[in-house]
Amino acid sequence: MAAAASTLASLSATAAAAAGKRLLLSSPSRSLSLSLASRGRIAVMPHLRAGILSAAPRRAVSASAPAAATIAVGDKLPDATLSYFDSPDGELKTVTVRDLTAGKKVVLFAVPGAFTPTCTQKHVPGFVAKAGELRAKGVDAVACVSVNDAFVMRAWKESLGVGDEVLLLSDGNGELARAMGVELDLSDKPAGLGVRSRRYALLAEDGVVKVLNLEEGGAFTTSSAEEMLKAL
């Protein structure tokens, strides 16, 4: 009788092992529970296992900073640090928009790029030629800003033969253009210009915009020195 019981127990164990193998092949989640149970450990329930797997780290999605509102008449110019060379062999210098405009009447105009045709042939030469007339109307300084590095701006100044009439400033990282909301994305153009600044000319008194001639894109219709003189 004892031998029969032993044989029956052996057959049951063999059947259980075979069933375990079938479970292992057909259901990985069940095999995990069976394996833990066979070792005397607590089985991981299916719903708990699903929760553990779903708790894998997820990549955080950061929202991009909202674009700045486009500058308008009556606005205070945002502060930014611009760089320049005051002479061919001089040291690199920086000036903030705040320091440039504090307590002064300043004409600031922007171009999409140094050495580009319209900027080189019309926009900058026009302000160089009219700088004296602008000063006669109370303007303390005339400055051109572009999203180019300071070395390019120095080379451009030398090629144009610009003296003290107009200060050529580098907004190399586009800090001022972004803060003013006047970015101009030219990434789709074959010249490789990337993101630049829209063309504009403005008059600021103690940092507050009094006159603003902002072009659509890189057009050149209202931002000339002549148009600024008419507005003064």
From Swiss-Prot:
Which PROSITE patterns does the UniProt entry name for this protein? THIOREDOXIN_2 (PS51352)
List its EC numbers: 1.11.1.25
Gene Ontology, cellular component aspect: chloroplast stroma; cytoplasm
The protein's superkingdom reads Eukaryota
GO-annotated biological processes: cell redox homeostasis; cellular response to oxidative stress; hydrogen peroxide catabolic process
Keywords for the protein's UniProt record, in alphabetical order:
Antioxidant, Chloroplast, Oxidoreductase, Peroxidase, Plastid, Redox-active center, Transit peptide
Q: Which locations, inside or outside the cell, does it occupy? A: Plastid, Chloroplast stroma
The role this protein plays is: Thiol-specific peroxidase that catalyzes the reduction of hydrogen peroxide and organic hydroperoxides to water and alcohols, respectively. Plays a role in cell protection against oxidative stress by detoxifying peroxides. May be involved in chloroplast redox homeostasis.
| Other comment | The active site is a conserved redox-active cysteine residue, the peroxidatic cysteine (C(P)), which makes the nucleophilic attack on the peroxide substrate. The peroxide oxidizes the C(P)-SH to cysteine sulfenic acid (C(P)-SOH), which then reacts with another cysteine residue, the resolving cysteine (C(R)), to form a disulfide bridge. The disulfide is subsequently reduced by an appropriate electron donor to complete the catalytic cycle. In this 1-Cys peroxiredoxin, no C(R) is present and C(P) instead forms a disulfide with a cysteine from another protein or with a small thiol molecule.
Which Pfam family is one of this chain's hits?
Answer: Redoxin
**A GO molecular-function annotation:** thioredoxin peroxidase activity
Q: Which reaction is the catalytic activity of this chain?
A: [glutaredoxin]-dithiol + a hydroperoxide = [glutaredoxin]-disulfide + an alcohol + H2O
* Active-site positions on this chain: 119
InterPro entries recorded for this chain?
PRX5-like, Redoxin, Thioredoxin-like_sf, Thioredoxin_domain
Q: Where is the transit peptide?
A: 1-62
All copies of domain Thioredoxin, residue ranges: 71-232
| Subunit structure, interactors included | Monomer.
Organism of derivation:
Oryza sativa subsp. japonica
SUPFAM superfamilies reported in the protein's UniProt record: Thioredoxin-like (SSF52833)
Q: Which family does it belong to?
A: Belongs to the peroxiredoxin family. Prx5 subfamily.
Protein name as catalogued: Peroxiredoxin-2E-1, chloroplastic
